[in-house]
Structure formats: C-alpha cells, structure tokens
C-alpha cells in the first residue's frame, strides 16, 4: 500500500507550492506507506486566508444548519471508520481495535457538538484549565 497525501486548502486537495513531500513511515516495521505534501509558508498563508474566509461564512450560518453540517461530519467519520482506523494503525502503530475506538470517539465528539450548537444561550463559560490552545 502506497499513497500520496496532499493538502486540503480552500476546498480542494493540492500539492505544496514547491511540490515538496516527506515520507510517512509505519513505526511498527519502518516501511514507507506513503508521501505527504510538505507545507511551505506560502501554503500555510493560503490555508489561514481560506480559514478566515470560512469563519466569516460560518459566523452567518444558522445554528440548525451548523448542527446539520457537524452531524454529517460525524456520519462521514463513522462511514469511513474502518479505513481511518487502518491508516491510524499504519501511521502511528496503534492496535487496530484501539484506533477504531479513537475514531469512534472523534465521531462522538462531533455528535455532541452538533447538539450543543442548538443551545446558544449567549453566555461564555471560562475554562478552569490554565492551559489554553
């Protein structure tokens, strides 16, 4: 199995601006399983610009539409759970059953967020954590 992975920027898959790649290696056997596109500062700038544009659209999206979109993401994750888990296993060496659980957990988080978009109360709750991302 050998794959080429691009960058998803502004709604489409593409190579990096300088066509650079790096090897994706299976840590269990050190086999090359693919090549991923190596982002340049130009690519990062394009991604940030696209994200800023997307945020302006998302801000104007009705809560029920946001919920629908986020739920579809959860559905797609579940639909592709087996292949995503397989790739996770190859890329990070995680046991397949554990990878499937992690992928399922990601879908659960999207489902939870889909429901939360329906509950907009106009309040902000501060994090108790001192670690901010």
Sequence positions of predicted segments:
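Long, charged, glycine-rich C-terminal linkers/tails
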Residues: 123-127
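Conserved small/polar residues in nucleotide/adenosyl-binding loops
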Residues: 131-133
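Glycine-rich loop-to-alpha-helix module at the N-terminal edge of alpha/beta enzyme cores
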Residues: 33-121
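Hydrophobic face of amphipathic alpha-helices that form TPR/SEL1-like repeat modules
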Residues: 1-28
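A generic, residue-level signal for flexible/boundary positions that often mark functional hotspots
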Residues: 3, 8, 33, 52-55, ...
């Amino acid at each position: 199995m050998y794959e080429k992975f691009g960058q998803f920027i502004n709604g489409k898959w593409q190579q990096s601006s300088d066509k650079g790649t790096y090897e994706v290696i299976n840590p269990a056997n050190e086999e090359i399983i693919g090549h991923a596109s190596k982002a340049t500062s130009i690519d990062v700038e394009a991604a940030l610009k696209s994200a800023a544009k997307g945020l302006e659209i998302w801000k104007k999206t009705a809560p029920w539409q946001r919920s629908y979109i986020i739920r579809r993401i959860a559905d797609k994750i579940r639909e592709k759970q087996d292949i995503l888990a397989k790739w996770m296993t190859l890329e990070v060496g995680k046991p397949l059953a554990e990878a499937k659980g992690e992928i399922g957990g990601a879908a659960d988080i999207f489902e939870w967020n889909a429901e939360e978009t329906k509950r907009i109360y106009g309040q902000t709750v501060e994090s108790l954590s001192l670690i901010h991302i």
